[in-house]
């Protein structure tokens, strides 16, 4: 069997979005499960719009998702001489020709065709004319066959046939000599010995044109697979409002790479009713021919559900660095407090993203500067001062700071003052966190630590006294 070689070829004119990442994932999985090579190519011939920042974001996004590549990144901007060489080869073999048609003529041609309800296309005016000796500007067009059809077996859509009469003579070199997309991608796939081109279905109209150029070059054809687009929850093309944002924005919003990878593989592909896939299972089970031909709908709630699953199941040690980044972005000082791993283990059941977890965990690391007004009004009352003082004294005298002993102090104090457990736990919670929501109060006290907990109880008691005064 031929050595499988797939590629991902993004254009660095913007961010790496969800659709592009899913295409990269499918291509990467196909290579990995066939012990093949995954090639990364940067299509940066659009000099005006390509930026180094976009290149950096693409590489960073792929690395974050651990979509690794065997070769590259190759840059089209560094291969211009090769493209010019192939263009000259096509002209010499009479598979391409100079076109001197002016912009005005082409506009007039298009308007006439539209007026006559015809499909706009180049009419071949210069196709059989001899090259001029003047210095007039010209483009170079590929001489597309006028007979027969282009037939190929799409890995996802099955057999596709396009009549060559539907295709006009596309431009392969602009008037400044610069190669066009359909030329560069053909040369790259040929030179890099790509065996399987897996890409978005927005490229499907380019495929028959590229196949004809490959035929003219005497090149072996790769297999093609066109992945349907991703729609928003409203059934329309995915917008920024519904998730069409940079993959790095998901990282910055506190999603885990495992969750996003798992979510993307299920966008348009299924393996029975299985929802959770490890990376090993993805490589083992993914089947490109089983990808749906219909567009997939992006579901933000499903992604959140998966993210929480991985927050609960991935080792806290693996998540700790990303969690620290979220805490620091929220302005939390991490010099004091419990280990990040302890907080992650405690909060994973209660939060869906690392960003949310960080927002709800600041009180483990720094003093509470203020209380939620509604929470203080309801729970920090004069009647609770004595029970709080009792809890404070008992906690201070514990021989060791253990969660079970802390729990006993709260239960016994509640019984002594004839309070329900919640009637005592909530004021303690407000004193410790400034609000009414936290993990179990004994676990919260344990992680905050004895010294800080006693300070916060003292502060709450003073706050109540000031309100009484």
Swiss-Prot record:
InterPro entries: aa-tRNA-synth_I_cd-bd, aa-tRNA-synth_I_codon-bd_sub2, aa-tRNA-synth_I_CS, aa_tRNA-synth_I_cd-bd_sf, Glu-tRNA-ligase_bac/mito, Glu/Gln-tRNA-synth, Glu/Gln-tRNA-synth_Ib_cat-dom, GluQ/Sye. A motif ('KMSKS' region) lies at residues 237-241. It comes from the Bacteria. It is found in: Cytoplasm. CDD domains: GluRS_core. One of its GO terms (molecular function) is tRNA binding. A motif ('HIGH' region) lies at residues 10-20. ATP binds at residue 240. GO terms for cellular component: cytosol. Its cofactor is Zn(2+). Its EC number is 6.1.1.17. Its main location: cytoplasm. Binds 1 zinc ion per subunit. Zn(2+) binds at residues 99, 101, 126, 128. Keywords: Aminoacyl-tRNA synthetase, ATP-binding, Cytoplasm, Ligase, Metal-binding, Nucleotide-binding, Protein biosynthesis, Zinc. PANTHER family: GLUTAMATE--TRNA LIGASE, GLUTAMATE--TRNA LIGASE, MITOCHONDRIAL-RELATED. Monomer. Catalyzes the attachment of glutamate to tRNA(Glu) in a two-step reaction: glutamate is first activated by ATP to form Glu-AMP and then transferred to the acceptor end of tRNA(Glu). Belongs to the class-I aminoacyl-tRNA synthetase family. Glutamate--tRNA ligase type 1 subfamily. This is Glutamate--tRNA ligase 1. The gene is gltX1.
């Amino acid at each position: 069997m031929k050595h499988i070689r797939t590629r991902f070829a993004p254009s660095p004119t913007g961010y790496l979005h969800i659709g592009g990442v899913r295409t990269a994932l499918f291509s990467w999985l196909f290579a990995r499960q066939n012990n093949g090579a995954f090639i990364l190519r940067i299509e940066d011939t659009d000099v005006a719009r390509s930026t180094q920042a976009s290149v950096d974001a693409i590489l960073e996004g792929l690395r974050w998702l651990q979509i690794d590549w065997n070769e590259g990144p190759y840059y089209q901007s560094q291969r211009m001489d090769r493209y010019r060489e192939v263009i000259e080869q096509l002209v010499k073999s009479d598979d391409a020709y100079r076109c001197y048609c002016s912009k005005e003529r082409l506009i007039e041609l298009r308007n006439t065709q539209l007026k006559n309800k015809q499909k706009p296309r180049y009419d071949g005016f210069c196709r059989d004319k001899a090259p001029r000796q003047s210095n007039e500007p010209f483009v170079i067009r590929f001489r597309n066959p006028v007979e027969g059809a282009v037939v190929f077996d799409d890995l996802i859509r099955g057999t596709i046939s396009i009549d060559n009469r539907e295709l006009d003579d596309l431009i392969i070199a602009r008037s400044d000599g610069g190669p066009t997309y359909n030329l560069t991608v053909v040369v790259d796939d040929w030179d890099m010995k790509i065996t399987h081109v897996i890409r978005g279905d927005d490229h499907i109209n380019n495929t028959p044109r590229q196949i004809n150029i490959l035929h003219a070059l005497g090149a072996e054809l790769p297999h093609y697979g066109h992945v349907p687009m991703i729609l928003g929850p409203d059934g329309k093309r995915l917008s920024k409002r519904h998730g069409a944002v940079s993959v790095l924005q998901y990282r910055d919003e506190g999603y885990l790479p495992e969750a996003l990878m798992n979510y993307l593989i299920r966008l348009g592909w299924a393996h029975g009713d299985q929802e959770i896939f490890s990376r090993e299972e993805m490589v083992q089970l993914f089947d490109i021919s089983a990808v749906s031909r219909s567009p997939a709908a992006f579901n933000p709630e499903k992604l959140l559900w998966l993210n929480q699953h991985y927050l609960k199941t991935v080792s806290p040690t693996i998540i700790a660095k990303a969690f620290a980044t979220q805490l620091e972005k929220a302005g939390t000082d991490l010099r004091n407090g419990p280990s990040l791993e302890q907080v992650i283990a405690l909060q994973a059941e209660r939060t869906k993203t690392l960003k949310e977890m960080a927002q709800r965990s600041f009180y483990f690391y720094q003093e509470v500067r203020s209380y939620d007004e509604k929470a203080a009004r309801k729970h920090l009352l004069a009647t609770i001062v004595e029970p709080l003082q009792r809890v404070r004294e008992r906690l201070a005298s514990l021989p060791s700071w253990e969660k079970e002993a802390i729990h006993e102090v709260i239960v016994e104090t509640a019984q002594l003052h004839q309070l329900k457990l919640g009637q005592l736990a909530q004021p303690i919670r407000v004193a410790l966190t400034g609000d009414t929501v936290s993990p179990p109060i004994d676990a919260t006290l344990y992680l905050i630590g004895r010294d800080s907990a006693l300070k916060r109880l003292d502060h709450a008691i003073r706050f109540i006294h000031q309100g009484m005064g």
